[in-house]
Regions:
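Active-site beta-loop-alpha junctions enriched in small/polar residues
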Residues: 19-23, 48-52, 76-80, 137-141
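Active-site acidic/histidine proton-transfer and metal-coordination neighborhood
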Residues: 1-44
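Gly/Pro-rich active-site loop or hairpin
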Residues: 29, 33, 53-130, 146-147
Length: 162
């Protein structure tokens, strides 16, 4: 990491945003903070709340723990499927195309967590120092792409403070 960071700095790069993802080296707030402490504060997080949701973590609590380390944010939601997750837990080996049988699914923004939750999430990200863009990631296979994008954009417009 230190060689990579030195190379990035030589190239004029000021920040590296690592997206936390289950099963990788950086999958939580604590793993990002540990890597950052061992290397350089130019490393921060590309905060994807859906990835924390499917692990059972609280993205709002994570945003608070990551004060000053949030370099980018995704607008991406996930839904824990009632009944299925209750019996099988959150570990999901099935492909995303088998949405009817999965214990969780990526869904359009507002179709997992409600709009009040999203308002709080974006508010906390802002309070913790993030004032950048939000990237919409649309991976909802329970509706058409157009419906998912439109649903997500509508939800994001209602929840991101201007």
């Amino acid at each position: 990491w230190n060689e990579f960071i030195a190379h990035c700095k030589k190239g004029g790069i000021e920040h590296i945003a690592i997206e936390e993802f289950p099963g990788t080296m950086v999958w939580s707030a604590s793993t990002l903070l540990k890597l950052r402490e061992a290397t350089d504060p130019m490393l921060g997080i590309n905060l994807d709340p859906s990835h924390m949701m499917v692990l059972g973590a609280d993205p709002i609590a994570a945003a608070r723990a990551l004060k000053g380390c949030i370099f980018h944010v995704h607008g991406k939601d996930a839904r824990i499927e009632r009944g299925l997750a209750d019996t099988d837990g959150l570990l999901e080996p099935r492909p995303v195309t088998e949405s009817a049988d999965r214990v969780w699914n990526y869904v359009a923004v507002g179709c997992g967590k409600d709009l009040q939750w999203w308002k709080e999430f974006f508010s906390v990200c802002h309070m913790m120092g993030y004032d950048g863009d939000v990237s919409l990631e649309m991976e909802d296979l329970t509706m058409t792409v157009d419906a998912g994008v439109n649903t997500s954009i509508d939800a994001l417009r209602q929840t991101i403070s201007q």
